[in-house]
């Protein structure tokens, strides 16, 4: 009986430790994915005046404006 209780407690303890470790790894995996997406977007370059900008960044000095056909990079309003 004592041996069974010790084994149950040991299994529960080890399960709790491994569950905690896997939760932390999942967070780091998500952070790594976000960093990878940023690197991919940065490598694509910026969008020039008149280019569509829904999911991409406009070049410096331009902003993504809305229109009937979707967003396009254009100079900011004064």
From Swiss-Prot:
Residues 20-41 form a propeptide. It is found in: Secreted. The keyword Disulfide bond applies. Disulfide bonds join 46-59, 53-64, 58-73. It comes from Conus bullatus (Bubble cone). Transmembrane segments: none annotated. GO terms for cellular component: extracellular region. This is Conotoxin Bu2. Expressed by the venom duct. Residues 1-19 form the signal peptide. InterPro entries: Conotoxin. The keyword Zinc-finger does not apply. Pfam families: Conotoxin. Its main location: secreted. One of its GO terms (molecular function) is toxin activity. Belongs to the conotoxin O1 superfamily.
């Amino acid at each position: 009986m004592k041996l069974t209780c010790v084994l149950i407690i040991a299994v529960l303890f080890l399960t709790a430790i491994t569950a905690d470790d896997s939760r932390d790894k999942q967070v780091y995996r998500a952070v790594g994915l976000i960093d990878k997406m940023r690197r991919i977007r940065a490598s694509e370059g910026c969008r020039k005046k008149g280019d569509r900008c829904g999911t991409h960044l406009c070049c410096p000095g331009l902003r993504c404006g809305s229109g009937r056909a979707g967003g396009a990079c254009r100079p900011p309003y004064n």
